[in-house]
Amino acid sequence: MPPKEESSKVTRRSTRSSASVTVENSEPIESHTPTIDDLTFGEESITIDAVLSNFPGRRSQIFDFIRLMGPLDCPTLPIMIYGGASTGKTSVVLQVLRHLNRPFVYSSCRTCYNPRILFESILNQSLLHRKCSLNGYSSAKRCDKPSDFVNLLREALSSVIKTLESTSETSRSDKPDEKPMGKMVYLILDNVDLIRDWDKGTIILQFLFSLYTVLKMPQLGIILISGLPPDVYYSNMGYTDPIPLYFPEYSEEDLRQIFLRNQPNRKLYSAFLDVVLKPFCRVTRRVEELSTTFSLLFRKFCEPLDDLGISPNEDMKRRLYSHLKPLIAHCLNEIFRVSSHPHDGETRGERRQKASYSSENREELEILDFHMSTSAKFLLLSAFLASRNPATLDASMFDSTGGMDNRKRKRKASEKSMEKKEIAEQEAVMKGPGSFPLERLLAIFQCIASVGDSSFGEEDEEEENTTGYDKENNNLMSDILLQVSSLCDANFLIKSGSCPLEGSIRYRSMVSEDLAQKVAKSLSFPLSKYLYRR
């Protein structure tokens, strides 16, 4: 989000998306002289019921945040809002401040990507300075050093607080019905976890965490928003630790309420969510990713309908699901794509993307185009089999005969068995890839790696050279746990929580069948022989 002084007064910070839009510089905006009202939304405050309805699943976090801020003009300790991406942290903070009509200064460490830009953004807002052509789009103060920033910010905040005190006394007599702004100002620093990647980022973080202690201004409230927990920033510098407030991932029911909001036909969309929400929630719970995918799928879901205002019955739901089913697997594989981290660079991101499934470039990906050790390949296949095969079939799958007996007598499928198979396929799509404990992964790995070792051994005997095989066989299990960690880092595996009874971590494979087949082909491993087909 850009610094606050660059947004218009009318649409001031109404949403994160509107705040990220660059506003054209026009004469009326440039002629506007910023006032103390520019430190608020510049709109009517909203009720607490409106805030709660706008953020399903965030009721407890909203009330906790209001409680931590305290009543009007109450000094507050620094607060750290933390949680994963797309959990509503920034939006909730801004809308609560709009509800309370509290003045604040907002700066994001994503757009303010170095200390100078961050310091000047905060000072510009505190000094009520707006960049425009009249001042050559320059900042009110040039500031590079933390020591200069402290002195300049103290002066700016002192002036703001004096103005708030006089405004508060005037508003009581002139506008008794309007919610007062109070005499405090809040400094909101968003995406503070990105500072860790800055040059001398550790020093800047320690400085920002100690800012409340250094300034010693009870009229200042500091709110830090982070994607990482407070433990990451722990230091023994002696500053006041911020009060943590955690925003967890949205539950499946929360996501349902979010996507049902503002839908003209809630019953039709609810039937659509019954089909797609559960499998996609196993992959991601980020609202923006799901929203993009669901928009495409819902249009496909509604194609057979002439009237979008109808309430579908059970028979119609089945027909709509059958129409949508071929696209679900493709969209799931698209979300399985491994996106590179911001600091990983373009090359790594392109390599991950090439390793992912895509129907458009399937022919180009017939050969595995990235390097992976033999043990990692077998581990990848083991995880794929553990996610796709029922655990109850492990004994028969990996017996001494080597996989399922494909020579069983085939019987003519009855209508009832076909119906059961259809239901099983539907359930499999809705469930998505299954989770498994580490012990099961290692057991499958040991079985299929021994099959691979046998084939390697036969080739070595023909060549009368067993040195390479012996070396490979001895080293195959040496780095298995390290490979599990590496596959998790690359998002080929994800941790799906721990079992409450066993207390052990469970994993889930994010690999598509096409990629698994390519890996198996590079090892000359008969994957289809061990893959359970319903």
Curated annotation (Swiss-Prot):
Chief location bin: nucleus
Residue ranges with Basic and acidic residues bias: 414-424
GO MF annotation, one: ATP binding
Induction remark: Accumulates 13 hours after cell cycle reactivation by sucrose addition following cell cycle arrest mediated by sucrose deprivation.
GO biological process: DNA replication
Region (Disordered) location: 1-36, 397-428
Cellular component GO terms, alphabetical: nucleus; origin recognition complex
InterPro entries according to UniProt: AAA_16, ORC5, ORC5_C, ORC5_lid, P-loop_NTPase
Entry binding sites for ATP: 83-90
Subcellular location per the Swiss-Prot or TrEMBL entry: Nucleus
Motif range (Nuclear localization signal): 129-136
Domain of life of the source: Eukaryota
Keywords annotated in UniProt: ATP-binding, DNA replication, Nucleotide-binding, Nucleus
Function, in words: Component of the origin recognition complex (ORC) that binds origins of replication. DNA-binding is ATP-dependent. The specific DNA sequences that define origins of replication have not been identified yet. ORC is required to assemble the pre-replication complex necessary to initiate DNA replication.
Subunit (UniProt): Component of the origin recognition complex (ORC) composed of at least ORC1 (ORC1A or ORC1B), ORC2, ORC3, ORC4, ORC5 and ORC6. ORC is regulated in a cell-cycle and development dependent manner. It is sequentially assembled at the exit from anaphase of mitosis and disassembled as cells enter S phase. Interacts directly with ORC1A, ORC1B, ORC2, ORC3, ORC4 and ORC6.
Family the UniProt entry places it in: Belongs to the ORC5 family.
Protein's name in the database: Origin of replication complex subunit 5
Organism name: Arabidopsis thaliana (Mouse-ear cress)
